[in-house]
Every structure is written in structure tokens, then in C-alpha cells.
């Protein structure tokens, strides 16, 4: 029991530091993500009932299935073959360089090189859905 005496203080500190965001930090990140996402609206919509354009509507994309979420949208075979769901790690890879993640994708966007901007967009996308 004595050896575990350090565990409680360690657990208390686990939520401290730069990685521990406050609600305000999260709100700021979502707002930044919304601003960065404006570039995406050249091809994507994000409204609950909005249709697809050159790209699929991204409402509810986070947590949704990859390459099959919008039945009327023509996803590439490469994207369909990925399988699984969009989580933060996969979305980060996709936003960094879609063509590297899925060779043959028809998404013309080259990617978002800045990791913070990608994280901001992912935070925004996570708020846009059920």
C-alpha cells in the first residue's frame, strides 16, 4: 500500500499542464477551426440538411464511416477501401495530405501543412454533427 502513495498526487497532476485545455481554450480552438474551415467551403458544405457539392457535406463526418457516409456522393475506390471511421488521427492524416493518405483521391486540395490549423479544424468538425 505504501508504494502506491505516490499514485494519488500523480493522478491529480495528470490533468495539469499545456495539454489540459479549459472550456475557453476549446471554444477558441473551435472558433479558429471554423475560420480555417472557410477554405473548405469552396467544395464542401457543413449544414445539417445541406447537399453535397464538389465534395461531400461534412456535417457529422467525425465518428462517421469513411467513404460511405453520404450515399449520393461518389467516393473514390481508394477512400472506400480505407474502411473504419473518421477519428482525430485519421482526419489529421487526411487534412495533412489527402493524396498521400489515399493515392488516386479526386480531392484537389493539397492539404493543411500546419498541425495546429489541422487540430483546430478537427475540433470544429467535431462540433458539427449529431
Briefly describe each language-model feature range:
Residues 29, 36-39, 54, 87-90, ...:
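Stable alpha-helical elements in mature extracytoplasmic
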Residues 1-20:
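Sec-dependent bacterial lipoprotein signal peptides
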Amino acid at each position: 500500500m505504501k508504494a502506491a502513495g505516490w499514485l494519488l498526487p500523480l493522478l491529480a497532476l495528470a490533468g495539469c499542464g499545456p495539454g489540459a485545455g479549459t472550456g475557453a481554450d476549446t471554444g477558441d480552438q473551435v472558433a479558429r477551426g471554423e475560420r480555417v474551415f472557410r477554405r473548405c467551403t469552396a467544395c464542401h458544405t457543413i449544414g445539417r440538411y445541406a447537399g453535397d457539392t464538389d465534395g461531400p457535406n461534412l456535417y457529422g463526418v467525425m465518428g462517421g464511416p469513411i467513404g460511405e457516409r453520404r450515399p449520393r456522393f461518389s467516393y473514390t475506390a481508394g477512400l472506400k477501401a480505407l474502411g473504419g471511421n473518421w477519428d482525430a488521427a485519421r482526419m489529421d492524416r487526411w487534412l495533412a495530405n489527402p493524396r498521400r493518405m489515399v493515392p488516386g483521391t479526386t480531392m484537389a486540395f493539397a492539404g493543411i501543412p500546419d498541425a495546429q490549423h489541422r487540430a483546430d479544424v478537427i475540433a470544429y468538425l467535431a462540433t458539427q454533427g449529431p
